[in-house]
Regions:
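The beta1-alpha1 cofactor-binding region of Rossmann-like NAD(H)/NADP(H)-dependent oxidoreductases
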Residues: 53-63, 94
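C-terminal beta-strand-loop-alpha-helix "lid" module of Rossmann-like NAD(P)-dependent dehydrogenases
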Residues: 162-209
Length: 266
């Protein structure tokens, strides 16, 4: 029997690349996104079903998961939906904060929880959650985004303990920079005039990263995490992410933070 993967945030970038990769390798793919009309290529791909799903809508999550499980035995859940909130924390509105946490953190928890009875009954399955290098290191003007990604890493690591006893694996994949339109399509900026000069310095620092990976390269790491059968909990994807995480460990946190401060804030 063929295997099935359920993907959130599959309209573009990594989610789309993962959907196409798994489909090309013979899997049945349930690709979900807020607006299915935005992904005609996926809708026309053999083995891919496209469904509408907003991970901030608990009722819709329950309905979609119930619909999918009536047809498919889901083997892998890929939590990919998310976006970046960047800029001065002081400039973030309550709606900014709520939306970031609701999408990046609560959306993952809701989708995962909806699938757990199915995976537990089967005593098998893998949950792969896309976090970020920003779940292991920090940069200026990304505080709330970091809160969600560090939160996901801690949540998943704890969850992996309890699910392992039930035959279910819980894993994270932490990509570095990806050559997609994330900065345009999936980035919201906060503003506050007191921080304008510092924000400009920081943005210039981000522009120096030339080691970003393609979405296809990161999707290969997702494939590895989903199919290698290992109990490994954390996966890091991309040369830049691996370098930064190793550098933080090698330098120690105080020296690493000093380096980041000098690079981005002068």
């Amino acid at each position: 029997m063929g295997k099935t993967i359920f993907i959130t945030g599959a309209s573009s970038g990594l989610g789309k690349a993962a959907a196409l990769l798994f489909a090309a390798r013979g899997w049945t793919v349930v690709a979900t996104m807020r607006n299915p009309d935005s992904a005609p290529e996926l809708a026309g791909t053999q083995g891919v079903s496209v469904l509408a799903l907003d991970v901030t809508d608990p009722a819709q999550i329950r309905q979609v998961v119930e619909k999918v499980l009536a047809i498919h035995r889901v083997d892998v859940v890929l939590n990919n939906a998310g976006y970046g909130l960047a800029g001065p924390f002081e400039g973030a509105t309550d709606d900014d904060l709520r939306r970031q946490i609701d999408t990046n953190l609560m959306g993952v928890l809701r989708v995962t929880q909806a699938f757990l009875p199915h995976l537990r009954q089967n005593r098998s399955g893998t949950i792969v959650t896309i976090t970020s290098v920003g779940g292991h290191v920090t940069f200026p003007f990304n505080s709330v985004y970091h809160a969600t990604k560090w939160g996901l890493e801690g949540w998943n690591e704890s969850l992996a303990f309890e699910l392992a006893e039930l035959g279910i694996r819980a894993k994270t994949v932490a990509p570095g920079g990806i050559l997609t339109d994330f900065a345009g399509r999936s980035l919201t900026l906060t503003k506050h005039p007191a921080y304008d000069a510092l924000v400009q310095k920081t943005m210039a620092g981000f522009g120096k990263n030339s080691n970003r990976s393609t979405a296809d390269q990161i999707a290969e790491v997702v494939w590895q995490a989903a199919t290698d059968g290992k109990d490994q909990v954390h996966y890091v994807a991309g040369k830049d992410a691996k370098f930064l995480i190793r550098l933080r460990k090698w330098l120690g946190v105080p020296r690493f933070l000093g380096m980041i401060r000098r690079r981005f804030l002068g």
